[in-house]
Amino acid sequence: MGDVEKGKKIFVQKCSQCHTVEKGGKHKTGPNLHQLFGRKTGEAEGFSYTAANKNKGITWGEDTLFEYLENPKKYIPGTKMIFAGIKKKTERDDLIAYLKEATAK
């Protein structure tokens, strides 16, 4: 399991420009991530997804996020997420630990 505090720093540096995590948070360039775990791809209400995201059909969890965050465009070809990914395993673990906590509140 990753380090939540380190994950928060990673989120602020690499994700917060496009995403929010809190309940009722607004969509930015990317969708609000509240209640992400257990949700299927392309299902954040009120966000306009690509067909690739809608049709991927996986449920977000630790394993799927771990793979996606390494290389989003490889995992979901056609996604509009322009982020190149996080290559370091420990950084992905930390970010997922933070997201698991922050998106559940």
UniProtKB/Swiss-Prot annotation:
Post-translational modification: Binds 1 heme c group covalently per subunit.
Keyword Cytoplasm listed: no
The keyword Electron transport is annotated on this UniProt entry: yes
Binding residues annotated for heme c, in chain numbering: C15, C18, H19, M81
A single GO molecular function term of this UniProt record: metal ion binding
UniProt main location, coarse: mitochondrion
Subcellular localization, as worded in the UniProt entry: Mitochondrion intermembrane space
Gene3D superfamilies (alphabetical): Cytochrome c-like domain (1.10.760.10)
Protein function: Electron carrier protein. The oxidized form of the cytochrome c heme group can accept an electron from the heme group of the cytochrome c1 subunit of cytochrome reductase. Cytochrome c then transfers this electron to the cytochrome oxidase complex, the final protein carrier in the mitochondrial electron-transport chain.
The protein's name in its UniProt record: Cytochrome c
UniProt source species: Varanus varius
Lineage, broadest ranks: Eukaryota, Metazoa, Chordata, Craniata, Vertebrata
